[in-house]
Regions:
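Conserved NAD+-utilizing ADP-ribose enzyme module
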Residues: 1-70, 76-145
């Protein structure tokens, strides 16, 4: 998965304190959760190995991208009265992940898991409220979406 940001707004930050962030995962328990992308397993309370956040800017592009890092959202909000009939049948609901609205089937099998970017870690936030960080830790807290 690739994280992108307008190059004029690209800014590396260092977490001054632990930061609560959120990930959509396909399985969650108090002990671990599994990412739907790459099937990566995060174990509760373990800080994941540090990754180098390499920024790439293609010639004549206004976007920077980071291809390796721990992706998360700065916030998640459930949109009131957002359940509607989907165009392919069934019902869907809208959930605001960061600054963008995502549509999920009501009968989905996903979870919202709470993570922490530990104090002292490097992270970037884009215009959509998507975060990429060099370290992350699963708290063991989650809810069914």
């Amino acid at each position: 998965m690739c994280w992108t940001c307008n190059i004029n707004k690209l800014k590396a930050q260092i977490a001054k304190e632990d930061i609560n962030v959120y990930k959509i995962v396909k399985k969650a328990t108090k002990e671990y959760c599994i990412s739907p992308f790459m099937d990566y397993t995060y174990y509760s309370k373990d800080i994941q190995p540090s990754l180098t956040l390499g920024v790439t800017i293609e010639p004549r592009s206004i976007f920077a991208k980071i291809t390796e890092g721990y992706h998360s959202y700065s916030s998640v909000n459930f949109v009131f009265d957002s359940v509607v009939e989907g165009i392919f049948g069934g019902y869907v609901k809208t959930i605001q992940c960061g600054n963008r609205k995502e549509i999920f089937r009501v009968d989905n099998s996903l979870y919202l898991a709470i993570f922490i970017i530990p104090s002292g870690c490097v992270y970037f936030t884009n215009e959509e409220g998507e975060i990429v960080s060099n370290k992350i830790r699963y708290t063991g807290k989650y809810i069914k979406l």
